[in-house]
Design a protein with these regions (language model features):
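Glycine/Thr-rich beta-alpha phosphate-binding loop at enzyme active sites
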Residues: 1-39
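A general structural detector for well-ordered alpha-helical segments in enzyme core domains, enriched
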Residues: 26-29, 76, 80-84
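Extended, intrinsically disordered, low-complexity segments
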Residues: 23, 82-104
């Protein structure tokens, strides 16, 4: 709220929850959903590093999406892709499908 005008800074008054704040809930939902459905699940919510991406993939996501972190670092997607490549190389994985999975 702008204390001088008394009006909200955001057009919709309250805004939404995104970025790191949503990650624990999003990760839990990916885990639960991936165990329940037989279609690919895309992990979204609070991904801002290669470690975050790996968590979502191990939880059962078939793919990930980076959103809010792009506002902070427009090159974050490339950094995460490069980091996933380095992770696979370091761990002798031919692809991300070789990651351990909590999806059972």
């Amino acid at each position: 709220i702008d204390v001088k005008s008394g009006k909200p800074w955001l057009a919709n008054t309250t805004g939404g929850v995104s970025g790191p704040a949503i990650k624990p809930m999003a990760l839990s939902m990916v885990y639960e959903t991936a165990r329940t459905v037989k279609i690919p699940v895309i992990g979204i919510g609070g991904i801002s590093s290669v470690e975050d991406a790996l968590e979502f993939l191990i939880a059962g996501a078939s793919a990930i999406q980076i959103g809010t972190a792009n506002y902070i670092d427009p090159s974050i997607t490339i950094k995460v892709i490069d980091g996933l490549y380095r992770y696979c190389k370091k761990n002798n994985l031919k692809s991300l499908t070789g990651l351990p999975s909590l999806k059972k």
